Design a protein with these regions (language model features):
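Alpha-helical transmembrane segments of multipass membrane proteins
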Residues: 49-57, 90, 114, 133, ...
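Hydrophobic alpha-helical transmembrane segments
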Residues: 43-47, 84, 88, 100-108, ...
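Short, Lys/Arg-rich, polar N-terminal cytosolic tail immediately upstream
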Residues: 8-37
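Hydrophobic transmembrane alpha-helices
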Residues: 31-93
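Membrane-embedded alpha-helical hairpins and interfacial helices in multi-pass inner-membrane proteins
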Residues: 69-71, 147-225
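Short helix-perturbing small/polar motifs within transmembrane alpha-helices
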Residues: 41-50, 128-170
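Interfacial aromatic-anchored transmembrane helix boundaries in multi-pass membrane proteins
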Residues: 110-137
């Protein structure tokens, strides 16, 4: 019985800030959001990836004639299996900088550089198809609202880049039979999914382990996407 017949109401314990660091850390992580705003460093890195990719595209232009002919001789349309060497810029840039538009930006810039350096494909077979490939890769991440940057989304992005490539050549080659065009489209999708998607995802993982991507979400150990 309290003294003087008065009820004493216990005062709730006041927790000092920092008493439960684990709780505070979990709470703060819940409110963190993926930042879609481009930084200068994002633009620079995406451009570097695009330039390096464009040089690789151009180098592949030089040596691709014989391999394409060989695959096409096996079955018309099988040459689409080699298209991924022109598809990877978008998915790779996107999973590194993780910003909307990165895939389209990198693939288009790489294609523009490839065209500028000179090749046998011209504007359509370099720049136009590059834009279509970039749009395809972009859709692969956009369908997840730019919050999923894993193996699945990257593989889908690579496959959709392959669709962009396959559709361009289907449209611009009306003499192709439906069978050949379908095979070309299918092999382009497979090529994009495997090399431009899966392989680029594991390449990004390997690069991240070196620490050079620490300024990006893709390079940090714990990322909320």
């Amino acid at each position: 019985m309290p003294a003087h017949g008065r009820l004493s109401i216990p005062v709730p314990c006041q927790r000092e800030k920092g008493t439960y660091p684990f709780f505070e850390e979990k709470q703060s992580s819940v409110v963190r959001k993926h930042n879609n705003k481009w930084r200068v460093v994002d633009i620079v890195v995406a451009a570097i990836i695009a330039v390096a990719s464009g040089v690789i595209f151009w180098g592949w232009d030089i040596v691709c004639t014989a391999p394409l002919a060989l695959f096409g001789a096996v079955t018309p349309g099988f040459e689409g299996l080699l298209n991924a060497f022109w598809l990877f810029a978008g998915p790779l840039a996107a999973i590194i900088v993780r910003k909307p538009g990165a895939a389209l930006f990198a693939e288009t810039l790489a294609a523009a550089l490839e065209l500028t350096m000179g090749n046998q494909w011209g504007v359509g077979g370099s720049l136009i198809v590059g834009i279509m490939q970039g749009f395809g890769a972009e859709i692969g991440f956009a369908v997840f609202a730019y919050r999923k940057w894993d193996l699945l989304s990257t593989t889908i992005a690579g496959a959709l880049a392959g669709i962009g490539c396959g559709l361009y050549y289907w449209i611009t080659n009306p003499a192709w039979s439906t069978v050949r065009a379908s095979i070309y489209l299918g092999t382009s999708i497979i090529s994009g999914a495997v090399l431009a998607g899966m392989v680029m995802y594991f390449l990004q993982q390997a690069i991240a382990k070196t620490g050079v991507l620490d300024r990006f979400e893709s390079g940090r150990a714990q990322v909320l996407v």
